[in-house]
Amino acid sequence: MTSQVQLDAGVVTRCRRRVHLEHDPEMRDVDKAPPDPAGEQRKADATEHRRQVSNALARLFGSQLMEIPFGPDIRTADRERVTLAAMQAGTPYIWGPALPRDLTGGRRGGIDLLVKDTTGYVPVLVVRHKTSDPGHGARTSPLSHPLPNGARVDPARKVRPQPRDQLRLAHAQRQLQAAGFAKHGRAMAGVIGMDADVVVWHDLEAPTWPGGRTALAEYDARFSDRLAVAGAAARGDEPLARPSRIVECKSCPWWPTCDVELKRTRDVSLVARGEDAIALRRAGVSTVDQLAEQTVGEPLIPLVGMPFDDAVILARAWLRDLTVVRRSERMTVPRADVEVDVDMESFADLGAYMWGCWLSGENVDEEPGYRAFATWDPVPSDDEARSFAEFWTWLTAVRLRARARGLSFRAYCYNELAENRWLLGSAERFKGMPGIPPVAQVREFIKSDAWVDLFGIVREEFLCAHGKGLKTIAPVAGFTWRDPEAGGENSMRWYRDAVGMDGNPPDDDQRRRLLEYNEDDVRATHALRNWMSSEEIKLLPFAGDL
């Protein structure tokens, strides 16, 4: 039986409600949110990365590699026919194939690369992110031999799971099986990552998913569900997916539609999103009002994202339009005689190009205020080592001078995950270069009381109805950024211009903009800490009063 709808691989990691809206005929003319510029740039970067990989493969394999034509004037049906002919001819390597539609299974789509094994084809995905980490155990093969039978256990790499990649590969595997072109035996599939030096191989039949499931089993369950959701929408049946707020909502083109509906119904996911919202609805709590009516100290059900009592208080805060409430009457914030606020700026996974600092407190023979340690060589580059070494040397000197004067010292960041990653990563990448500290020294610092994560304190001391991000919390403390477009996603675009990444001359105005943005970030954590330590904090609503 032919399926009424054919879905691509993206649906299995997409919100169920979005799948419904994309296939509901009545929603075709509804206004959607404009494309996110940062998201569009990531897509463009990924396209360029795939082009670089295809060029490398063309140099390696010459006439053995066939590229399926692609463009706005080329119909998908024509691309599918060319791909089918190439597979029937046994072409060793097929770039950009549009796989035959699985009309019975309801599948459509393509993959970046097909490689011919002795008994059939194997799908390979090309992505612009890391597919492995330092370690051992990953099965890899060199780019010059991108076949699973050439894979060996890599002594220097361990697999970075990347569930989305595995699900996309599972979709292609099912298409190949339906068309009769899949390699016989165990389902293996490969990924070429950001470094593009090896193929990392995934066993799609290995029980590596939660509960001992395989990637194929996980994919099959998700795809079956999304196919049912899309089919019901296309037929005009009762929807199988209702709006519910999740993390991805903020970048979804359908958010304006769902936002209106969620607020109209005062849906409980406006306060407790994701799995917690599902659990609450099952327990009969569907609205923010119903959640606010629950009794503190008598949890109805256990929640995953937060304690039940916190959810109740957040619901009451939401009804009063309160952004932040404090958990306790007295608040403790670690302070010191000499304080440094630190903020790191990175460009995706490629490198950390700036370490900004705000020095305040007692005199240590250093000018108080802002300083930045930056490189304007496009990352990754060896000049990162210089800027990181200068930052670490300066920070260490301030600590030592404070100690010599009998003064206490603390450095602060907001959400240490990013800073810690690049502190340790930079020490590891550049070890042995001038001024680079040993990894053990960096690890000792980040584990010490001298390194304070303000995000962790905010999480412990406040309940936040609209998120805990610095851009949300600092304005409550009275701080504002000078740039109305300040934000991590926008800074990615500014950085591209600042270093001339797209072939244009480096833009000095964007460099100044990034420096100002970074300065405001460290000033924001400084202002937030001062506010949390002041008497003004008592003016903030107290959770106990709600």
Language model regions located:
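C-terminal extensions
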Residues: C258-A272, D276-W392
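Acidic, Mg2+-coordinating catalytic module of metal-dependent nucleases/exonucleases
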Residues: D165, H171-Q175, G185-T265, I473-L546
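Generic beta-strand/beta-sheet core signal
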Residues: Q294, V342, S360, Y412-N415, ...
